[in-house]
């Protein structure tokens, strides 16, 4: 029998309360929480809302776990009380079909409203639903529940999506030569770096050391200068400085990692060419600020691509000059680089000149 709405509300209210040191970890308080079913992995369950999403916190999930992922984990563990609780709080019971492993648990999920089975389209939608939740716990649990799961491994549309994502940054392995399981693992690893989640980054780094240079590659491509600095100084890499710069120029606005590579000695003129080839005007202006001057070669590329915007920018070459404030810093300290070139702070001197012309 499902609990009443009042019971559900009472449990939810209790789970949102701050636990005072006066009562925690008292036996009485623990007893109340256990009686209410607000207990998981030998610790209390608390909830909080982040951007309209309910996140579950326990001692094991200190960074917060999305309610739907928490349901999937509870189903995997055959924890009937929590399956019911998370469903009452709004989790989609259909996601439980991903991790169900006994007939009794499947029966419970279906009694709570789950379908008989999920279509390939619904499997893909589940992936989309959980992939953008930015916490270390979410990234790690998503990887553990999905990366080796047949429902996801056999989804052709998901494979196309992941191949597209990895193709954008893969340079030291051929996608056709690795399994889809490894592709998914590399994908979740890259998301940890993109979202700048130290705990998740360390989890993947320790678990998948044989992914040679992957952490460095993702740090460059996703503009995570702090992680780039850490891994570059921690391990020897087979990737040369100019190749690192090419990766940093992969996406527009990667100002901190471009600058970091420049400080290591990468060719800023080649970076300017790469930026034009990728059609990134933001990176182009940074390269000009850092002294790049291969305007004629870049103009040829812009003309061949019929890119009027870049042609216009490059045509004002006689008005541009290096930005002394950027060149005088001369540091690989990620904190200082970030303060100088954070995307929300940095305003290109030469872009301002271009706009005034």
From Swiss-Prot:
Lineage runs: Viruses, Varidnaviria, Bamfordvirae, Nucleocytoviricota, Pokkesviricetes
Q: Which organism is it from?
A: African swine fever virus (isolate Tick/Malawi/Lil 20-1/1983)
Keywords assigned: ANK repeat
What is this protein called in UniProt? Protein MGF 360-22R
Q: Which residues cross the membrane?
A: none
Q: Name one GO biological process term.
A: taxis
Q: Which family does it belong to?
A: Belongs to the asfivirus MGF 360 family.
| Ranges occupied by ANK repeats | 66-98
What does the record give as the function of this protein? Answer: Plays a role in virus cell tropism, and may be required for efficient virus replication in macrophages.
